A protein has these predicted regions:
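N-terminal Sec-pathway targeting helices
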Residues: 1-16
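Intrinsically disordered, low-structural-confidence terminal and linker regions
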Residues: 9, 23-24
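Alpha-helical transmembrane segments
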Residues: 17-22
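Aromatic (tryptophan-biased) beta-strands that constitute blades/sheets of beta-rich domains
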Residues: 24-101, 128-135, 170-175, 180-186, ...
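Repeat-blade elements of multi-bladed beta-propeller folds
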Residues: 25-30, 59-70, 96-118, 137-171, ...
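Short, glycine/acidic-enriched capping/hinge loops at junctions between secondary-structure elements
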Residues: 75-79, 116, 123
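Glycine-rich phosphate/oxyanion-binding loops and their immediately adjacent helices
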Residues: 113, 125, 216, 244, ...
């Protein structure tokens, strides 16, 4: 009998040890999440290539770079722009404060907001000041342009570090030609780069809500609550709005009604803006992984560990996902499987998003350098001694580079 009791106690101890080990493994896995390999045989639309559904040429000439990430899908790939390095600086303009997000380009002007609340419109050809506004509120997002109006989010009064979660924020609507304020919408602190689709202006707020505001009535059509602050912009495709929250979730909602279609979880915060291509949602997470979810289902298709936080939003081109990591490496990942096609040691953490132009992928590091790599093989083609976050946008004549406190207009050498 005693022997049976001893065996029973030993079995119980083993079960407890196994349970503790299993729980410990789950905790370890959450803190050190690994790679989950995917396949292009599941929810992969090869024909959904970035840049295929291009805007009319006349519209592109007037508004060559209308929003953060170039298009509604935030692909960060601009078709038809064939500007290649080496570049010469045609002009440069000091902003007096940090440029955390890149400009947009429209109506032959470049529009950008600096961290201290200064918003400027520069002549694209010369860099001369067209108009400026002083908001006195922190700006940590790109504007968006639609039908003659520039929409810029505002945070709490400068400096940015003193923000409170319940502080007010705004999105202001400015006449793109004169800078006149047309109207503003109050929400919580707004850090997300907005998006206009049709008559609806979409943006998220630290008040935990995603907003859809009618640009004609200036009223909210719907709001969608999440479990934490929204700090990254939304993306749009096929009638669905995709966005992420600091509640560790990605959401897909009906763009007209705000009705939830699906939500999916990561193991830490999502700061990055989603990128949509090939029927998938690509997004980085502070757990150090890049995720691919199905646009229609929300199913996890792959997750790639990078060795450091992924604040960077992704660019997509030629069935490849381009993204930087705090591990100081820049990655080109197979969009189908998540496998590494190539990687590049950038020498410093990467926080901002890349851009692909004419087969070259551009990105900056926190070491204040900007690189241009051959997007096919990762070979370094160009380097510039400024830039910190999301550096490059373009039109048919210039590449515009957001440095730490300067904006540059670049021209191809000899062009």
């Amino acid at each position: 009998m005693r022997k049976r009791w001893i065996l029973a106690i030993l079995a119980l101890v083993l079960l407890l040890v196994a349970g503790v080990a299993a729980a410990g493994y789950v905790v370890w896995q959450k803190r050190h999440p690994g790679t989950i390999r995917g396949s292009s045989s599941t929810e992969f639309v090869a024909t959904e290539e970035p840049g295929v559904a291009t805007r009319p040429e006349r519209q592109v000439q007037k508004i060559p770079w209308p929003t953060y990430g170039y298009d509604e899908q935030r692909s960060r790939f601009a078709p038809g722009i064939d500007l290649r390095p080496p570049f010469d600086v045609a002009w440069q303009r000091g902003t007096g404060s940090l440029l955390e997000f890149p400009p947009v380009v429209a109506y032959w002007r470049v529009y950008v907001g600096a961290n201290d609340g200064r918003f400027i419109a520069l002549e694209a050809e010369t860099g001369h000041l067209s108009w400026k506004k002083e908001f006195g509120r922190c700006i940590a997002s790109s504007p968006t342009v639609s039908r003659g109006v520039v929409y810029q989010p505002l945070m709490d009064p400068f400096p940015c570090a003193q923000h409170k979660l319940n502080a007010p924020g705004y999105v202001v609507a400015l006449d793109a030609h004169t800078g006149e304020e047309l109207w503003r919408f109050q929400a919580g602190v707004v850090e997300t780069s907005p998006l206009v689709v049709g008559n609806l202006l979409y943006f998220g707020s630290w008040d935990t809500k995603m907003y859809a505001v009618d640009v004609k009535t200036h009223k909210a059509v719907w709001t969608f609550p999440t479990g934490d602050a929204l700090k990254a912009g939304p993306a749009y495709a096929h009638g669905t709005l995709y966005f992420a929250s600091y509640d560790d979730k990605v959401y897909a909602v009906d763009a007209l009604t705000g009705k939830l279609r699906w939500s999916a979880s990561g193991t830490a915060n999502f700061y990055a803006t989603p990128t949509l291509a090939y029927g998938r949602v690509f997004i980085g997470n502070t757990d150090g992984r890049v995720y691919a979810f199905g646009e229609q289902s929300g199913h996890l298709l792959w997750a790639k560990a990078t060795g450091g936080y992924v604040y960077s939003s992704a660019a997509v081109w030629q069935k490849t996902v381009y993204v930087g990591s705090y591990s100081k490496r820049f990655y080109a990942l197979d969009a189908g499987s998540g496998d590494v096609r190539w990687s590049f040691d950038a020498g410093a953490p990467i926080s901002g998003a890349p851009t692909v132009l004419d087969g070259i992928v551009y990105f900056s590091t926190l070491g204040e350098k900007t690189f241009g790599l051959d997007a096919r093989n990762g070979k370094k083609l160009w380097e510039f001694g400024d830039g910190k976050y999301s550096p490059v946008v373009a039109d048919e004549q210039h590449v515009y580079l957001a440095g730490y406190k300067k904006l540059y207009g670049l021209l191809p050498r000899g062009g």
